[in-house]
């Protein structure tokens, strides 16, 4: 079957590249069509921010937090990825680098807490309560991790 990967013998996958030819100009039109106005138009973006600020959100700080948590989390993951898949060693230097990146993540987490007017204790307590409901016996369960009850985010 085209596209199957042979994981034995380190052979290249048997892929017929013509099976999945895409008209990139049509794809670009599709992507543009399913993109919200605030994502592609500056004035709509500003109006969206103004509307959210008018609703009482601290959107500028939330946006800072969201972008920062994602970026710094990616840097943390990059170190782990290189250790697991690219031969980077587990050593004091890499451990310290992970701690530094984790500190950067926490800085942005605190930005989010400040934007939401909550404490880190509130976040942790809420997380513990959520997980107690998901795992009432106090132990991980694969089924419950994949099959959530209604309202379990």
Task: Tell what function each PLM region has.
Residues 2-153:
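Flexible "arm" and connector segments at domain edges
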